[in-house]
């Protein structure tokens, strides 16, 4: 079997391998990493284990005594699916980047910082590998075809793939033909945003530090009065200068 040359190609190949064995989702990254690397590489991943280091979601490090590699992760993370994506991320570093250094330390800001100028190319590539491995596009499309996208539908996909809601929403944005944008905010200001391809062409992007529209803040403040799946149509000037939008918030 020829080794792929890009993160997405690696993810696609190993995702197909997982599905070909008849195994269900979510992909067991630990099992796959251990089995694949020991049969294909002289310096395999020898162990996947918790590390107990606060603030470090995941690490990939070479073990000097054994000459193999270790993936370790923060077992105290409570966000559903985040550990699984972290393992996929570190597996991506192994496949694509292990020739460049002997240790990778990754925190949550590295895993999600898609639009920061300071975000390293390698982190983006590791994220891309994990996305293609854990959430194959063809299967994802089957889960959402002929359905209206909603918070609960994306939540179903997140549960199926063992990924966080955020990672799942980002995957949908990568494959959708709709103009859509994910916005993550804290304390009434945008932390980061990620647009779909069509939304990007329409200049639908909010940079970090942008104030969240007052109407959205008021809506979240009254969260008990609306359903998670309730979409509200808002006019131009709220999320885009000239376009209306359908807004869903959690």
Cite the ranges covered by each PLM segment.
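Active-site hotspot residues in diverse enzymes, especially metal/ion-binding acidic/histidine motifs
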Residues: 1-250
């Amino acid at each position: 079997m020829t080794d792929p040359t890009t993160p997405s190609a690696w993810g696609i190949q190993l995702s197909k391998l997982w599905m070909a064995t008849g195994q269900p989702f979510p992909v067991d990254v630990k099992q796959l990493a251990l089995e694949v690397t020991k049969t294909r590489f002289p310096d395999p991943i020898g162990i996947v284990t918790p590390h107990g280091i606060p603030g470090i979601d995941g690490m990939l490090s070479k073990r000097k005594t054994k000459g193999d590699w270790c993936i370790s992760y923060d077992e105290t993370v409570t966000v559903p699916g985040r550990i699984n994506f972290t393992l996929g991320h570190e597996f991506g570093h192994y496949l694509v980047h292990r020739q460049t250094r002997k240790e990778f330390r990754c925190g949550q800001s590295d895993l999600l910082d898609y639009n920061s100028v300071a975000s390293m190319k390698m982190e983006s590539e590791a994220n891309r590998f994990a996305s293609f491995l854990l959430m194959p596009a063809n299967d994802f499309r089957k889960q959402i075809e002929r359905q209206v996208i909603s918070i609960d539908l994306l939540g179903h996909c997140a549960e199926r793939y063992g990924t966080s809601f955020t990672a799942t929403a980002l995957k949908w944005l990568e494959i959708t033909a709709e103009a859509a944008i994910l916005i993550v905010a804290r304390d009434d200001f945008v932390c980061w945003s990620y647009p779909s391809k069509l939304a990007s062409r329409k200049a639908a992007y909010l940079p970090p530090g942008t104030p969240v529209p007052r109407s959205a803040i008021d809506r979240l403040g009254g969260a008990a009065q609306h359903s998670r799946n309730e979409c509200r149509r808002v006019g131009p000037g709220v999320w885009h200068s000239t376009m209306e939008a359908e807004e869903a918030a959690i």
